[in-house]
């Protein structure tokens, strides 16, 4: 079937669209729709053809298949369009550790290098993102838990998994792979026969029809893409059986539960797109690309989760469609994934719980980082603080108005002529002295350093980059890729060259960049952003080290940039100190290296609302340390929006105020009273909760969990909450947050998923009963409820900066459950700075309350506890205990269990439910 011919009509329509554009979004015309992206158009046409020809069995036939030692191996074959040649595609289905299955497919001719390109500098094989990113090292085949149950002439069945609950059924013709759990289908590959891998064609064989379909070159927005390797897209349909809600594939401003992309009333007309771009003043509620790309999708139904990870670094689109499920009144979700180039590399996770999915997925791509303590405090930024005097005045003003904060940031104007790794000495004559003054208060400075380098022979970074041949090349493969960015004419670091990445890291050394130990890094514009480039980015036919076109690696360019920065900062700190990096661009695994923010928001209520599902989606997809600019990057918020955004942002994992250079100054005291006092108290709430936040980050680091739990994750059985994305929990602390995101209201409705009792964190009011509850929400009071059955751990003493709290005592707030009158919680502690926690220098204390007994237990796990560190923390204690939900209790027993030694004593409870100075020390 010559599927390329199907799209001729759509191609003509795309030309009309390109001429007349769209009236939605001020800059939408700069970015491709699926119909304007040749490979996307071809794959969507394939899907359209399948719907119109239901008896069609796909492009491929099975040539051979076998099973041995945990791997199904086989070969597909496909006839060329003229019927003269047979093309072979080896594939495998591998059974890995952690109950993960991997489906891979490649193209024999490119894999073996028998193809011929006009440019000999190009690598002949397809790009393998998993190899480049180190995923293969963690994707170990583990055949011990995989057993061939049956092989016939038509199918092959394998049982796998540590508990033997999972089954894979491979049907030979037409080819289909069904994944079952406990005998029930969960995920099906190629049910619609949309498996596609465009085979190599000599350019001399091209036809006018292929030219029209963008197979050999394309022009968009007057930018020409030469496509010297011809068509090489990959595609596959993936069905989530009996799952009506799917989540993930950030970064988008869509809802948490992904919408359909088939023109349905509640959905979109475009697929979700993964192509990292510099998208300013972006639309809310859109499947358009943003700054990051994680091709991870999770499906959820009552008490069941599955997921897939599509390991591909090229431009990718995902169609989502709902259909009737196998159960009465149920839905299944059919998805169609297609990427411009690369291999087909899919990982399948069958849960059954979300925690199982996150454990296995993060073990593959890398656990989220455990950040330094200061970085989960408050960050003050704008474009730009204009001088040392400006920086130090802002710093002093925070102390004057008694507001805590941890970092102040410098945007591009600090650097001489925007030449990174330099200082404008007219405005920053003595940066080290400035850093020392900040350090005296345990505060940090974070500066922007972007991967575009001013093309200037008198600039040492530019000279070295060019002299060492470390820059990205244009399509010739000889000349450096030159274009404009913030410094004017620029060249870009080629982070795919290991030597270039190491050189980039060396620029952070103290003898190369005038700085100090309390200076950390912001890598922006690393999509990469290119002014007046195609779709605000680099030409897809630019060439990177190794002979890869930019199209092959685009979505991981930012990740490789961050990898170089991270390694450089590790070396700068002699391997002892945890770095802090903020990135705008990201991919799967970037969370092991950096935090991110969601880019150039606008100061509107709509953008405030949209930030919540975006941050939630980033989190469940692995990018846990995420946040949005307070109170929007573009524009000047009124006082109400300003305060409401702070109310929301104190519950982002990453909490930073930032604003455009053309906005009015908006440090948190500039709106005057009563707003200054309102924001002050909001900042203090964030700092009181630092122990809770840090413990949530520890859980994320050790298990891959998000920092913020969506409703479906906290209440996996409650179908009413599966699509809720305007409220969330802070880790497993029991804190339920419902930000106010509309103007002129003083109360809000919170959805409670169960009959448990919930306590208002502000005045301890009790709410109970499944359903919607109305709670007060005057300006400055963010609605936060503490769910019964939890123990909240805080530090009530407010210091200038987070690190200054490390010796302060703790407060326990015990919210007893409705049934059983019990509660639990736990606390993680380390020095908040170094990697010494890997040597056992940390404390974990588990608290439980039942029958009037509060038990504190040492829950330290591997590596063994460091006696020296433990001894150094003997001063830490609980100074106060609050009990909610047991108004009549007059005393409780405290039980302390450390190293199997049990100590008990009784303490009195006053009429307010408070125990002061209970003499409970952590060690």
From Swiss-Prot:
Q: Which InterPro entries match?
A: DUF5110 (IPR033403), Gal_mutarotase_sf_dom (IPR011013), Glyco_hydro_31_C (IPR048395), Glyco_hydro_31_N_dom (IPR025887), Glyco_hydro_31_TIM (IPR000322), Glyco_hydro_b (IPR013780), Glycoside_hydrolase_SF (IPR017853)
- GO cellular component term, pick one: glucosidase II complex
What is its subcellular localisation?
Answer: Endoplasmic reticulum
| TM region(s), chain numbering | none
State the phenotype upon gene disruption.
Gls2 and alg6 double mutant cells that transfer Man(9)GlcNAc(2) and that are unable to remove the glucose units as they lack gls2, grow at 37 degrees Celsius, but are characterized by swollen cells, displaying pear, lemon and round shapes and have, when grown at 28 degrees Celsius, a phenotype of growth and morphology almost identical to that of wild-type cells, indicating that facilitation of glycoprotein folding mediated by the interaction of calnexin and monoglucosylated oligosaccharides does not necessarily require cycles of reglucosylation and deglucosylation.
Pathway this chain belongs to: Glycan metabolism; N-glycan metabolism
- What EC number(s) does its UniProt record assign? 3.2.1.207
Please list the GO terms describing molecular function: alpha-glucosidase activity; carbohydrate binding; Glc2Man9GlcNAc2 oligosaccharide glucosidase activity
Keywords, A to Z? Endoplasmic reticulum, Glycoprotein, Glycosidase, Hydrolase, Signal
Which residues are the active-site ones? 524, 527, 600
Q: Where does the record say carbohydrate is attached?
A: 262, 563, 822
Which is a GO BP term held by this UniProt record? carbohydrate metabolic process
SUPFAM superfamilies linked to this entry: (Trans)glycosidases (SSF51445), Galactose mutarotase-like (SSF74650), Glycosyl hydrolase domain (SSF51011)
Q: Note the superkingdom of the native organism.
A: Eukaryota
Q: How does it assemble?
A: Heterodimer of a catalytic subunit alpha (gls2) and a subunit beta (gtb1).
Which family does the record claim for this protein?
A: Belongs to the glycosyl hydrolase 31 family.
Task performed by this protein: Catalytic subunit of glucosidase 2, which cleaves sequentially the 2 innermost alpha-1,3-linked glucose residues from the Glc(2)Man(9)GlcNAc(2) oligosaccharide precursor of immature glycoproteins.
| Name of the protein | Glucosidase 2 subunit alpha
Q: Which organism is it from?
A: Schizosaccharomyces pombe (strain 972 / ATCC 24843)
What does the organism's lineage look like at the top?
A: Eukaryota, Fungi, Dikarya, Ascomycota, Taphrinomycotina
Q: Which gene encodes it?
A: gls2
């Amino acid at each position: 079937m010559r599927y390329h011919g199907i799209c001729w009509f759509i191609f003509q329509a795309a030309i009309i669209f390109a001429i007349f554009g769209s009236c939605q979004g001020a800059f939408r015309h700069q970015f491709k729709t699926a119909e304007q992206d040749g490979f996307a158009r071809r794959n969507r046409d394939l899907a359209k053809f399948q719907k119109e020809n239901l008896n069609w069995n796909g492009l491929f036939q099975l040539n051979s298949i076998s099973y041995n030692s945990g791997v199904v191996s086989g070969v597909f074959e496909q006839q060329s369009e003229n019927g003269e040649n047979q093309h072979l595609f080896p594939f495998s289905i591998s059974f890995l550790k952690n109950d993960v299955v991997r489906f891979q497919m490649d193209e024999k001719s490119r894999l073996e290098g028998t193809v011929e390109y006009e440019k000999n500098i190009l690598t002949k094989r397809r790009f393998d993102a998993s190899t480049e990113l180190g995923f293969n090292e963690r994707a170990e085949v583990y055949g011990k838990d995989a057993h061939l149950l049956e092989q016939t002439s038509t199918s092959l069945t394998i049982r796998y998994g540590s508990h033997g609950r999972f089954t894979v059924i491979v049907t030979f013709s037409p080819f289909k792979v069904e994944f079952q759990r406990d005998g029930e289908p969960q995920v099906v590959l190629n049910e619609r026969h949309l498996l596609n891998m465009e085979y190599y064609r000599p350019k001399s064989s091209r036809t006018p029809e292929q030219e029209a379909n963008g197979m050999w070159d394309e022009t968009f927005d007057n930018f020409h893409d030469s496509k010297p390797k011809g068509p090489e897209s990959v595609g596959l349909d993936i069905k989530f059986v009996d799952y009506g809600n799917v989540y993930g594939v950030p970064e988008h401003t869509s809802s948490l539960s992904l919408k359909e992309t088939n023109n349905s009333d509640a959905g979109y007309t475009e697929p979700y797109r993964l192509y990292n771009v510099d998208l300013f003043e972006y639309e809310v509620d859109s499947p358009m690309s943003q700054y990051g790309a994680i091709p991870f999708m999770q499906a959820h139904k009552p008490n069941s989760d599955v997921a897939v990870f599509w390991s591909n670094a090229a431009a990718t689109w995902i169609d989502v469609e709902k259909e009737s499920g196998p159960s009465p009144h149920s839905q299944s979700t059919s998805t169609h994934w297609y990427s411009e180039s690369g291999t087909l590399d899919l990982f399948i996770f069958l849960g059954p719980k979300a925690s199982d999915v996150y454990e296995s997925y993060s073990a593959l791509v890398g656990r989220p980082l455990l950040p330094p303590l200061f970085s989960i405090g408050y960050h003050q930024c704008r474009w730009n603080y204009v001088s040392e005097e400006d920086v130090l005045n802002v710093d002093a003003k925070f102390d004057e108005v008694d507001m805590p904060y941890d970092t102040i940031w410098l945007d591009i104007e600090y650097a001489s002529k925007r030449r990174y790794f330099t200082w404008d000495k007219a405005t920053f004559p003595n940066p080290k002295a400035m850093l020392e003054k900040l350090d005296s208060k345990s505060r940090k400075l974070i500066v922007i350093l972007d991967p575009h380098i001013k093309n200037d022979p008198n600039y040492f970074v530019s000279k070295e980059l060019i002299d060492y041949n470390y820059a990205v090349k244009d399509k010739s493969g000889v000349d450096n890729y030159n274009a404009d960015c913030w410094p004017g004419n620029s060249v870009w670091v080629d982070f795919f060259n290991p030597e270039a990445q190491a050189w980039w890291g060396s620029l952070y050394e103290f003898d190369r960049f005038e700085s100090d130990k309390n200076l950390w890094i912001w890598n922006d514009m690393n999509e990469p952003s290119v002014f007046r480039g195609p779709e605000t980015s680099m030409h897809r036919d630019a060439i990177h080290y190794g002979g890869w076109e930019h199209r092959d690696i685009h979505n991981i360019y930012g990740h490789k940039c961050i990898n170089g920065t991270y390694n450089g900062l590790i070396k700068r700190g002699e391997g002892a100190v945890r770095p802090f990096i903020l990135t705008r661009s990201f991919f799967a695994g970037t969370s092991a290296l950096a935090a991110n923010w969601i880019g150039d928001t606008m100061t509107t209520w709509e953008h405030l609302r949209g930030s919540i599902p975006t941050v939630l989606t980033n989190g469940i997809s692995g990018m846990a340390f995420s946040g949005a600019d307070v109170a929007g990057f573009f524009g000047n918020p009124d006082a109400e929006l300003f305060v409401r955004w702070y109310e929301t942002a104190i519950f982002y994992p990453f909490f930073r105020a930032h604003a455009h250079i053309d906005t009015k100054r908006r440090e948190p005291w500039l709106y005057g009273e009563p707003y200054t006092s309102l924001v002050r108290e909001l900042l203090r709430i964030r700092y009181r909760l630092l122990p809770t936040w840090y413990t949530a980050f520890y859980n994320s680091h050790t298990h891959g969990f998000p920092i913020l739990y969506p409703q479906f994750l906290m209440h996996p059985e409650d179908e009413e909450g599966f699509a809720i994305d305007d409220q969330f929990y802070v880790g497993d602390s029991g804190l339920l947050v419902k930000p106010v995101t509309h103007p002129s209201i003083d109360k809000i409705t919170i959805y409670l998923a169960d009959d448990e009792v919930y306590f208002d964190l502000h005045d301890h009011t009790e709410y109970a009963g499944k359903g919607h509850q109305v709670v007060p929400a005057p300006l400055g009071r963010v609605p936060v409820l503490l769910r019964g059955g939890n123990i909240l751990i805080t530090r009530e003493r407010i210091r200038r900066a987070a690190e200054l709290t490390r010796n302060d005592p703790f407060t326990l707030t015990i919210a007893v459950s409705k049934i059983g009158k019990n509660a639990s919680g736990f606390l993680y502690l380390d020095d908040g700075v170094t990697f010494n926690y890997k040597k056992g220098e940390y404390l974990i204390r588990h608290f439980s309350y039942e029958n009037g007994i509060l038990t504190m237990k040492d829950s330290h796990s591997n590596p063994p506890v460091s006696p020296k560190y433990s001894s150094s923390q003997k001063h830490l204690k609980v100074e106060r205990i609050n009990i909610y939900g047991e108004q009549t209790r007059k005393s409780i027993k405290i039980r302390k269990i450390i190293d199997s030694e049990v100590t008990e004593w009784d303490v009195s409870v006053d009429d307010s439910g408070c125990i002061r100075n209970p003499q409970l020390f952590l060690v």
